């Protein structure tokens, strides 16, 4: 089948590789423009572009997909199907209506739950025990189209975004190939979503990274693993940003202390009071340093019981 593939990050590259391996005719790849990344802010191509170049697939990187010139280019490619995986932009009607087999999307949630740009993050932050991937026919709405296939995965109590991302990238690629085969046979189902059940996974912003110690230990633990490895969560210690990368929830103790108060400091972790129970910090990263386990952190830094995290200023009591 003649396919135009639209996608940008690693999650999308996994699906593109599956199409290539399945022998599908990917006639072009559309991806976001190269952008500066990392501390050096060096311009880097998106993972999808890197893969497309490896297989000598033509790459388009328009700054806008709404201009007539781009739409004409896609039309001239005569795609039977357009596959969209984490592309990062809303497709105009002119593109949606172009391919005879439709525009197909691989979305990293069990629709209609977690529509939007950060479904894996929010599923974990909200403490879900299950998520998955859905393939669907795209329409004008945001993740509102008729569903084709679904595949679910369980979320363990210590699973991070990184772990679930990799599972869903692989499952989504397999589901996409199944979906393409159904399209080729003209027997793909169209299952309407129940819009009344829809929930949303909005784009992550800087304010979402801040740890609120006045939440429960469970909520904070879910927050930390729901932002690992990107973009991370943080608190303030000694007037510096202290990123928290890994936590566990120990047995509950009845302790009278304000949320954010450091209760114990040991090589096994930093025990902090929350609004509901305690949480043990296992891996962290002080501003200007690299991420490390608590044991290594305490070799160079001293954090005392009584310290209140989250406050600008001194080291606490």
From Swiss-Prot:
Entry-linked Gene3D superfamilies: 3.40.50.12230
Catalytic activity: L-methionyl-tRNA(fMet) + (6R)-10-formyltetrahydrofolate = N-formyl-L-methionyl-tRNA(fMet) + (6S)-5,6,7,8-tetrahydrofolate + H(+)
InterPro entries for the chain: Fmt (IPR005794), Formyl_trans_C (IPR005793), Formyl_transf_N (IPR002376), Formyl_transf_N_sf (IPR036477), Formyl_transferase-like_C_sf (IPR011034), GART_AS (IPR001555), Met-tRNA-FMT_C (IPR044135), Met-tRNA-FMT_N (IPR041711)
Listed GO CC annotations: cytosol
The protein's Enzyme Commission number: 2.1.2.9
GO molecular function, one term: methionyl-tRNA formyltransferase activity
Keyword Transferase part of the UniProt annotation: yes
Chain residues that bind (6S)-5,6,7,8-tetrahydrofolate: 109-112
Pfam families attached to this UniProt entry: Formyl_trans_C (PF02911), Formyl_trans_N (PF00551)
PROSITE patterns in UniProt: GART
CDD domains, per the entry: FMT_core_Met-tRNA-FMT_N (cd08646), Met_tRNA_FMT_C (cd08704)
Keywords: Protein biosynthesis, Transferase
Family in the record: Belongs to the Fmt family.
Purpose of the protein: Attaches a formyl group to the free amino group of methionyl-tRNA(fMet). The formyl group appears to play a dual role in the initiator identity of N-formylmethionyl-tRNA by promoting its recognition by IF2 and preventing the misappropriation of this tRNA by the elongation apparatus.
PANTHER family: METHIONYL-TRNA FORMYLTRANSFERASE, METHIONYL-TRNA FORMYLTRANSFERASE, MITOCHONDRIAL
Protein name: Methionyl-tRNA formyltransferase
Gene from which the chain derives: fmt
């Amino acid at each position: 089948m003649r396919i135009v593939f639209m996608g940008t990050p690693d999650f999308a590259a996994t699906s593109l590789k599956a199409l290539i391996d399945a022998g599908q005719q990917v006639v072009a790849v559309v991806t976001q423009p190269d952008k500066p990344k990392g501390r050096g802010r060096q311009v880097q191509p998106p993972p999808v572009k890197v893969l497309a170049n490896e297989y000598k697939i033509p790459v388009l990187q328009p700054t806008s997909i709404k201009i007539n010139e781009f739409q004409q280019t896609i039309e001239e490619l005569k795609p039977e199907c357009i596959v969209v995986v984490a592309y990062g932009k809303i497709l105009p009607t002119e593109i949606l209506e172009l391919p005879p087999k439709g525009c197909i999307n691989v979305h990293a949630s069990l629709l209609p739950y977690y529509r939007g740009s950060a479904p894996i993050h929010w599923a974990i932050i909200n403490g879900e025990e299950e998520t998955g991937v859905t393939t669907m026919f795209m329409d004008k709405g945001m993740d509102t189209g008729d569903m084709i296939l679904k595949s679910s995965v369980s979320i363990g109590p210590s699973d991070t975004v990184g772990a679930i991302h990799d599972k869903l990238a692989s499952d989504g690629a397999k589901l996409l190939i199944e979906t393409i085969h159904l399209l080729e046979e003209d027997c793909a189902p169209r299952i309407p979503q129940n819009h009344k059940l829809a929930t949303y996974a909005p784009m992550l912003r800087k304010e979402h990274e801040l740890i609120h110690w006045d939440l429960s230990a469970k909520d904070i633990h879910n927050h930390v693993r729901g932002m690992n490895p990107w973009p991370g969560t943080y608190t303030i210690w000694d007037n510096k940003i202290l990123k928290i990368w890994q936590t566990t929830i120990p047995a509950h103790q009845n302790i009278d202390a304000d949320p954010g108060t450091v209760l114990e400091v040991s090589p096994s972790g930093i025990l902090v009071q929350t609004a509901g129970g305690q949480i043990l910090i296992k891996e962290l990263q002080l501003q200007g340093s690299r991420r490390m386990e608590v044991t290594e952190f305490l070799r160079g830094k001293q954090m005392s019981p009584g310290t209140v995290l989250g406050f600008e200023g001194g080291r606490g009591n």
